[in-house]
Each structure stands twice: as structure tokens, then as C-alpha cells.
């Protein structure tokens, strides 16, 4: 099920029009199209819902543990005002993480990529969707649980 704020989704991406200034990004022609792309991509995670919070669109949902089936992680993906030029912020709202957890930034934000990686394997405004970030968060959770069990963070650092 796709969510479109208003109008219909164009078949091709219109030119970016964020410079219009006052309107939230999702109310511009490009933004409506991009929100359709984002919503369609998030259909891969049916437990996530899009809501409006504090002037931003936010996806909220749970990811389940792969190593401990009863463990659940409440995750939010918040679009910034200048999306897609700025990356959405991912936060693992619960559970709380112990101090010293590797690859965890302030406010329970997992380090999913290094900005210096750019389009190679980091955030790319043209290709990265909220769905991409949720999938990367699931990988981060798996690495976190592996680190808890073994004391070693698997794979390379973000």
C-alpha cells in the first residue's frame, strides 16, 4: 500500500525544487514523487508506519533480533528538512544500550556508514531510501548482538 501525501505520483522524477523554500520537501513536485519512491521501498518492512512528528516525516517500526527471537528493537527513521540532500536520521529508541557500545553515536544512533564513503557504500541522495537505512540498521543490530556474545565486532567498521 503506497502513501502519497497529495496528487499523483509522476512516472519520472521531476527536477528538484527544494529551493522553493517554504513548503516541506514532501509537498513539492519532486518531493511527492520521492515520497512515493520511499513509500514503495518501505513496503519491504510492513511493520513500519510513516507518521508526522515535530514537523518531520518519520518511519517508526520494530526490528526483531536474529539471535534472540524475543528481542525487539524500536527504530525510527526521521527525514530532515533538506531531504534528500541530507540523510535521514536513524535512532534505535529501545532498548537502551550500555555505555561503550561500539559504532553507536549519540542518542542511540547506530553508525551505519562513514560519510567519507559517499556513494560508494554510504548515503547517496539519488539511491538511498529509508528502506536502505532500515536494512543497514538490521545489519548493525546483528553485529551488535554478535559483539555482545563474542566481544568482537564482526566485519569492517562503518
Residue ranges and their predicted role:
Residues 1-73, 82-158:
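UBC/E2-like fold recognition across ubiquitin and ubiquitin-like conjugation systems
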Residues 75-77:
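Hydrophobic/aromatic beta-strand elements that line small-molecule binding cavities or substrate pockets
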Amino acid at each position: 500500500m503506497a502513501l502519497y501525501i497529495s496528487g499523483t505520483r509522476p512516472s519520472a522524477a521531476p527536477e528538484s525544487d527544494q529551493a522553493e523554500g517554504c513548503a516541506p520537501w514532501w509537498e513539492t513536485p519532486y518531493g511527492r514523487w520521492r515520497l512515493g519512491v520511499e513509500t514503495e521501498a518501505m513496503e519491504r518492512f510492513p511493520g513500519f508506519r510513516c507518521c508526522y512528528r515535530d514537523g518531520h516525516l518519520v518511519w517508526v517500526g520494530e526490528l526483531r533480533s536474529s539471535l534472540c527471537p524475543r528481542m525487539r528493537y524500536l527504530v525510527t527513521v526521521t527525514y530532515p528538512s533538506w531531504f534528500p540532500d541530507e540523510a535521514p536520521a536513524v535512532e534505535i529508541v529501545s532498548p537502551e544500550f550500555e555505555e561503550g557500545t561500539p559504532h553507536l553515536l549519540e542518542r542511540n544512533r547506530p553508525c551505519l556508514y562513514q560519510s567519507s564513503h559517499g556513494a560508494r557504500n554510504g548515503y547517496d541522495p539519488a539511491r538511498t531510501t529509508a528502506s536502505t537505512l532500515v536494512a543497514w540498521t538490521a545489519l548493525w543490530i546483528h553485529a551488535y548482538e554478535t559483539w555482545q556474545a563474542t566481544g568482537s565486532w564482526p566485519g569492517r567498521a562503518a
